[in-house]
Design a protein with these regions (language model features):
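Buried hydrophobic residues that stabilize the cores of well-folded domains
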Residues: 1-188
């Protein structure tokens, strides 16, 4: 299965970009929600001493991100993500360094090209995310339902996005559903 996706995508790559650390994100504010910092551009790939933390992004001729290779702690080994674009959704297929399928996700978009839902299924369970926007197109909430291997729903988390008067992101709160507790996971 890996070879099918790799061959299909590799033939469509028209340019590559190299970064130390993750740089591009598919879902809004994903770096802030998980505590990552955006990666740094690598100007000369030949000067890299280790592939750990190396991100190689492949783009097609329409400049769509279609491949992500993530360097891991084992030298010259990568995790692979292949992105396939359709009219109203994008499919992501994620493999580990031994080329085993770990996860498949579907990103659903509305007419404004905003993500509205994400469905994912992996070896350890799955998830469903709903993205809610206000009248000015600002993301205000993500509702994340989590499922175990047997597709039994476990926890539900809510990410709430707060903006300042200039409509700039001010903070992100995380809270479990049906609980008054919330935690600030990012603030400016």
């Amino acid at each position: 299965m890996f070879d099918f996706f790799e061959n299909n995508v590799e033939n469509k790559i028209s340019k590559r970009e190299y970064y130390k650390g993750p740089f591009y994100e598919i879902t809004p504010f994903s770096f802030q929600r998980v505590g990552f910092k955006q990666g740094k551009t690598i100007k000369d790939i030949n000067k890299i001493k280790s592939t750990k933390g190396l991100y190689i992004y492949g783009f097609d001729k329409e400049n769509n991100l279609i491949e992500v290779k993530e360097g891991i702690s084992i030298p010259e080994q990568f995790y692979y993500q292949f992105l396939l674009y359709e009219k109203d959704y994008t499919k992501s297929v994620f493999f580990n360094n031994t080329k085993e399928l770990l996860n498949v996700s579907f990103f659903i978009f509305d007419n404004n090209k905003r993500i509205t839902k994400v469905y994912s299924k992996g070896t350890m369970g799955g998830g469903e995310e709903e993205y809610i926007y206000d009248d000015s197109n600002k993301l205000v909430k993500i509702i994340k339902k989590q499922f175990n291997k047997k597709c039994i729903q476990g926890g539900t988390l809510i990410h709430t996005f707060e903006y300042d008067d200039n409509k700039m992101l001010k903070s992100i709160l995380k809270s479990p559903l049906d609980n008054n507790y919330s935690q600030t996971i990012w603030s400016r």
